[in-house]
Each structure stands twice: as structure tokens, then as C-alpha cells.
Amino acid sequence: MEARIDEKGKFFTPRITKDAITAFVRTANKIIVGSVYVRPGNRLTDELNNDPSSFLPITDVRVYDAEDERFQFQSSFILAAYREILLISELDALATIRDVPWNAPSAEPTPLIREDDNLGVHINERGKYFTVRTPKDAVLCAVRGGDLAVLGYLYVRPDWRLKDELNDDQARYLPMTDARVFRVSNNMLLYHASFLLIGRHAIDIVAPIDAVTGVSNVPWLPIRSTEGEG
């Protein structure tokens, strides 16, 4: 068994060359900011949906409480259970809509893996953003899961229904663009991402906006009022 062992234990070393992407990970109770690893030529979507393992390795990690965003701990390496990951995005894909602690300069950890380290890792400053590799239709949807609601565009193959995309067992995470994430209990806008991945296991309801009727007073379910129309 080959392992890198030093006074801090076993560190993570990719067995094949991968790109390091700074990621934002949201679980029910935690916010995790750190580096995840993607094979060259793969998108983050491809990497997560094709990984047969149960845990995602993350390095250079900062962990915050999801409720009050208070810093909890920092680690050079953790493993996050896929079943607990609700949302995951490249950090650079998040718009700055408010001050958050993980964007503070003092929050930057000392990197475990640096550009001059020979660990089979490429450091990408911006990572890989979402590109549709097969023609798909963008469908504006509201997605509910627990106390989170996400409004944004899901993608459906032209000869598929939305139901078919959601029932695709190969899609552990569903890509969404122009995604706004709200806390349902107070309708607060938490994050706005040009691209994020939603854990299929965490979804309670998916509602295409065009299919919703009635009047809504919540920001994550915008419904065109029919009042005054003949």
C-alpha cells in the first residue's frame, strides 16, 4: 500500500493528474470551502456524476456553520459524504451579493498543494464552468429541498421530458445556471451562482415556473399575475 505519511498523517494525493478547483459546498448544517479535483477535460458535473465512491475528497478546507455562517474549523484535508451535499459550485461562480466570511482575505488558508509541489495536480485559478455538450433546452424551475429553495435553469434534452432528466440514475447532481438560493423560512437570498450542482437526493419538489398557476408572494417562486387579463 502506497501512502504519503508524515507527522500529520496521510495527506491526499491524486493517483492521476487532476485539476484543483476551489469549490463552495453546502450541506444541511455546514458550508465547506476548499479544493476539489477534476480530471483534465472533465467538467465538475462529469467528475461528480461519474465518481462511484461515497465520499468526496476536499483539501485546504474551511468549514462554517450553515445557519449563522460562523467559522468552525480549518483542515488540510477532509472527506465529505456525497449523500450530505445539497449544493456544490465553483467559488468563482458565486456572485458577491453580501459580505460572507469565506471571502475575507484573512480566511485564506495556507495551501496544502501548491504549484511547485509535484503531486500530480494542476492548479486552476478559475476552474471549469458549465458548458452544455449536447443540445438541451433551458427550463426555468423552482427546486425545493428542506429549508432551501433554488430558482434557476435546469437543462432537458430535446427528446426528453423534465421527468426523464430527474429520473436519470446516472445524474447524482443536476446542473443549474443563473441559480438563486433562498432560505425558505425567511425568504432570504443566500447565494446567487452562475452555475451550481444540486444533489438529486436532496430534492423534495421541482416546479417548472411555466407550469405554476396562482399568485405567489415568495421570491423563489415568481408567478406572473393574471389579474386584469381578459
Which sequence ranges carry the predicted segments?
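Conserved RNA-binding domains used in RNP assembly and mRNA/RNA metabolism
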Residues: 1-230
